[in-house]
């Protein structure tokens, strides 16, 4: 499958390019990007959920692709991670 680069607030993530007819593709793409952002932060799921103030179960459901995550939420989280990494407060 072809790959494409997805840029979230300066974090570049390589994702598989999905068929447009696949109705679950967007949810899976966002879930994968969320996991990559968390890993970039250097935090565990538990630590990341506490740091964000998001219930662990909600974050877990987003990361596993079981619950749809709004793209604007993903962008806000990416923005926070990028800025905290830049300031040296995480990572």
Summary of predicted features, one role per range:
Residues 42-60:
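Short alpha-helical DNA-recognition segment
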Residues 1-28, 76-78, 83-91:
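N-terminal flexible/basic segments that precede or flank functional cores
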Residues 32-47, 76:
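Short basic helix-loop element that most often maps to the first helix and adjoining turn
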Residues 34, 52-53, 80-81:
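Secretory-pathway ectodomains
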Residues 66-78:
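Short, basic-rich loop-to-helix N-cap that marks the start of a DNA-contacting helix
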Residues 29-30, 54:
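Alpha-helix N-cap/N′ positions at the starts of helices
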């Amino acid at each position: 499958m072809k790959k494409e680069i997805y840029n979230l607030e300066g974090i570049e993530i390589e994702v598989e390019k999905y068929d447009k007819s696949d109705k679950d593709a967007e949810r899976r793409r966002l879930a994968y990007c969320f996991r990559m952002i968390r890993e970039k932060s250097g935090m565990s799921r538990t630590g990341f959920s506490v740091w964000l103030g998001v219930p662990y179960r909600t974050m877990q459901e987003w990361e596993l692709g079981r619950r749809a995550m709004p793209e604007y939420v993903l962008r806000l989280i990416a923005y926070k991670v990028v800025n905290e990494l830049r300031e040296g407060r995480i990572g």
